[in-house]
């Protein structure tokens, strides 16, 4: 494309063009679509985990890491029946982002319970329990209930 060759637009991935100053969250949801921002990215900003990560972590239909301008976008695959359910996912300004409660459930689901959370107090436990049936997993339910009791 003419504007990409001239440097007016960036071409981070085939078929995707952005202005030089772009919203990284919006780009994350565009790079691999459909997807939504979740996991460590959301949990760190909510104060549930204290580990810093510069990666923008997303849920999608496949595992992939894409780097654009030094920013890593990490996509984790999850069952399509789960990511297709929009419960606990906020949609605004071309950005789909999980609530901290949904990100917590995504993390426990994908890590098979092998994850650590620094502070579960920011989570709305009623909302966690409301979203939990989306995953249709008795094992996940047991793990989540054990974590919420701690």
Question: Where are the regions a protein language model picked out?
Answer:
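Short beta-edge/loop segments at beta->alpha junctions of small alpha/beta modules
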Residues: 1-37
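Hydrophobic/aromatic-lined pockets within catalytic cores
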Residues: 8, 47, 109, 113
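Short coil/loop linkers at secondary-structure junctions
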Residues: 48-49, 138
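Exposed, interaction-prone assembly regions rather than primary DNA-binding/catalytic cores
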Residues: 49-101
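Hydrophobic alpha-helical interaction segments
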Residues: 86-150
């Amino acid at each position: 494309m003419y504007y990409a060759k001239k440097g007016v637009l960036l071409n981070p991935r085939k078929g995707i063009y952005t202005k030089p100053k772009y919203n990284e969250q919006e780009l994350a949801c565009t790079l691999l679509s459909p997807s939504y921002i979740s996991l460590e990215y959301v949990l760190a900003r909510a104060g549930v985990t204290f580990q810093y990560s510069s990666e923008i972590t997303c849920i999608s239909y496949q595992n992939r890491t894409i780097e654009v301008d030094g920013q890593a976008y990490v996509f984790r695959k999850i069952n399509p029946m789960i990511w297709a359910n929009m419960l606990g996912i906020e949609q605004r300004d071309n950005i789909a982002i999980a609530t901290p409660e949904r990100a917590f459930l995504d993390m426990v689901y994908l890590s098979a319970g092998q994850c650590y959370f620094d502070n579960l107090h920011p989570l709305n436990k009623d909302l966690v329990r409301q979203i939990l049936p989306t995953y249709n997993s008795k094992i996940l339910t047991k793990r989540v209930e054990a974590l919420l009791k701690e």
